[in-house]
């Protein structure tokens, strides 16, 4: 019983830490980590996101190091950034939180890098309101991987979001149904130095800050239309 209570307390503390205020330096580190994740995944020769999905993407979210706790209640949480395609390139990024839970025993904690790709205009639409739940408010599917994945068509009919994970060097599509995605308004305000409307930022009405230029350039490079990777 004591071990159970101790584990539960640790889980709550870890989850609370994910919601703690971040410094601008922390946010800069998060953006740089997101770019590193994107670079490492997209520079793989074959085991990567198919070209037709890259070309069709409307928004891209990267969550470096999402945690699945090694506790009785398998809480999952992570923080990341999102940018969306606009009429003149890709938007400045906003900060998001992801949280979910899988009931049951967990053995060992895991840290997993996630990439979310919206493949139509509805993919991240609910995020503009405040938050949404994957699989409920936005239909989602584990994304196809590799050049052969271009032949897969099921996702075109059934999904607004495609989700990918990398764990211990292995990259694959992953189901994230039940995971909540919400605006991190505090971190976004800290990064920009003033409150920002997610709708305004993601529609390209806010300039890309110097600290986010390299991340946005990386997204623009990898998710470029009509370009061989």
Task: Give the residues covered by each predicted segment.
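Sec-dependent N-terminal signal peptides
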Residues: 4-14
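Generic cytosolic/nucleocytoplasmic N-terminal low-complexity/intrinsically disordered segments
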Residues: 1-2, 38
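Basic side chains
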Residues: 2-3, 30
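Sec/Tat signal peptide C-region and signal peptidase I cleavage site
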Residues: 15-21
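Small-residue-enriched, tightly packed secondary-structure blocks
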Residues: 21-229
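Eukaryotic low-complexity, non-globular regulatory regions
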Residues: 3-5, 228-229
């Amino acid at each position: 019983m004591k071990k159970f209570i101790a584990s539960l307390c640790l889980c709550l503390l870890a989850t609370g830490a994910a919601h703690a205020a971040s410094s601008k330096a922390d946010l800069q580190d998060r953006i740089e980590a997101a770019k590193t994740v994107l670079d490492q995944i997209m520079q793989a020769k074959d085991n990567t996101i198919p070209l037709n999905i890259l070309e069709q993407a409307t928004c891209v979210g990267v969550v470096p190091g999402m945690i699945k706790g090694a506790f009785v209640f398998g809480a999952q949480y992570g923080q990341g950034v999102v940018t969306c395609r606009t009429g003149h390139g890709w938007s400045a990024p906003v900060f998001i939180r992801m949280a979910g839970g899988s009931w049951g025993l967990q053995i060992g904690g895991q840290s997993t890098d996630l990439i979310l790709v919206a493949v139509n205009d509805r993919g991240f639409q609910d995020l503009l309101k405040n938050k949404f739940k994957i699989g409920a408010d936005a239909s989602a599917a584990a994304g196809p991987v590799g050049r052969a994945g271009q032949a897969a068509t099921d996702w075109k009919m059934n999904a607004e979001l495609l989700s990918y994970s990398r764990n211990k060097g292995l990259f694959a599509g992953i189901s994230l149904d039940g995971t909540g995605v919400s605006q991190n308004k505090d971190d976004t305000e800290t990064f920009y130095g003033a409150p920002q409307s997610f709708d305004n930022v993601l529609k390209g009405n806010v300039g890309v800050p110097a600290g986010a230029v390299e991340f946005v350039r990386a997204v623009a490079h990898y998710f470029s239309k009509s370009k061989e990777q």
